[in-house]
Amino acid sequence: MSSAHFNRGPAYGLSAEVKNKLAQKYDHQREQELREWIEGVTGRRIGNNFMDGLKDGIILCEFINKLQPGSVKKINESTQNWHQLENIGNFIKAITKYGVKPHDIFEANDLFENTNHTQVQSTLLALASMAKTKGNKVNVGVKYAEKQERKFEPGKLREGRNIIGLQMGTNKFASQQGMTAYGTRRHLYDPKLGTDQPLDQATISLQMGTNKGASQAGMTAPGTKRQIFEPGLGMEHCDTLNVSLQMGSNKGASQRGMTVYGLPRQVYDPKYCLTPEYPELGEPAHNHHAHNYYNSA
C-alpha cells in the first residue's frame, strides 16, 4: 500500500475556495528559513519539496530529539502509511511537552494528506520561537517574553488594601469619619461644639426645614376619638343628636320615629287616622240582625 492512497482528490466549490485562501497565506521565505534550520540541526537533506520531505515524520522525530533528547523513543523507518502517521503523532506529542501551545499545533492529516500546509508551517515557526526562548541559537521565529514575577511580603500586601488606586478615581480627601452603620441613628450636631445634649424631641431643627409655626398639640393617637370642640368653652356635654356643620347639613332631617333595624315600621300617622264611633262585634249596642250567619256543612 502506497502513501498515494491517502491523498485526497481535487476540491470543488467552497472546499476549493478555502484551500486556495490557506495556500495564499503560505510564506515561501519562511519555508527556506525553516529548511536551513532543520537541515542544520539534523544534518539530513529534506529534498526539493519541503512538505513531501517531512511527510513520513522521520526527519521531524529526529529534529525534536536533537532539541529535546529522548522525546521520541522509537522512530519507524517503514514506508507503511500507519507507521508514517505514527511518527507524525509522536512528533506532535513531543512538541506539546516541549512547550508549544496546543492551538499552534497542526493535525496529522494537515501534513500527511496535504490539506493545510500553512498550519504545518505555523507550527514549525512556533517551535522555533520556543527553542529560541529555551536558549537555542535560531534565526527563525520570535523569542517569547519571559515572565517577570514579583513576590511581596504579607505585610506589604496588607498595606496595599488600605490604598485606593487611581484607577478607581479619587475621593478628594474625603473619609468615612463619623459615619455610622447602615440603619443606625445619626446625630445632627457636632460634639466639638459642646452640644452633646440634643434638643428636645418636640423641636424641629432648621436642618430639617421649617414647620411654619405648626405643632402637634392636640393631636391624638391614630384610631382614637378626636374632640371637635374647644374644652375651654364648656361644650363637653353638647347634644350628640345634632349634626355639626363641620360634618355637613342634614337639611333638618332627624331619626325620630326610626325603629331598630329588623322591626316592623308603621306606615301611617295617628294624627291623620280617625277613631271608629260605631259599636264593634260583641258589644251590647251591636245590631246582630244585620248579619246573616251560616253554618258550614
Swiss-Prot record:
Keywords: Actin-binding, Calmodulin-binding, Phosphoprotein, Repeat
Ion transport among keywords: no
Residues recorded with modification Phosphoserine: S175
Function as written in the Swiss-Prot or TrEMBL entry: Thin filament-associated protein that is implicated in the regulation and modulation of smooth muscle contraction. It is capable of binding to actin, calmodulin and tropomyosin. The interaction of calponin with actin inhibits the actomyosin Mg-ATPase activity.
Protein's name according to its UniProt entry: Calponin-1
SUPFAM superfamilies: Calponin-homology domain, CH-domain (SSF47576)
Sequence similarity: Belongs to the calponin family.
Domain Calponin-homology (CH) span(s) in chain numbering: 28-131
Residues found modified as Phosphothreonine: T170, T180, T184, T259
Gene3D superfamilies: Calponin-like domain (1.10.418.10)
Intrachain S-S bonds: none
A GO biological-process term: negative regulation of vascular associated smooth muscle cell proliferation
Subunit structure, interactors included: Part of cGMP kinase signaling complex at least composed of ACTA2/alpha-actin, CNN1/calponin H1, PLN/phospholamban, PRKG1 and ITPR1.
Entry GO CC: actin cytoskeleton; cytoskeleton; focal adhesion
One Gene Ontology molecular-function label: actin filament binding
Domain of life, source organism: Eukaryota
Lineage of the species this protein comes from: Eukaryota, Metazoa, Chordata, Craniata, Vertebrata
Tissue: Smooth muscle, and tissues containing significant amounts of smooth muscle.
Pfam family, one: Calponin
Residue spans of the Calponin-like repeats: 164-189, 204-229, 243-268
CDD domains linked: CH_CNN1
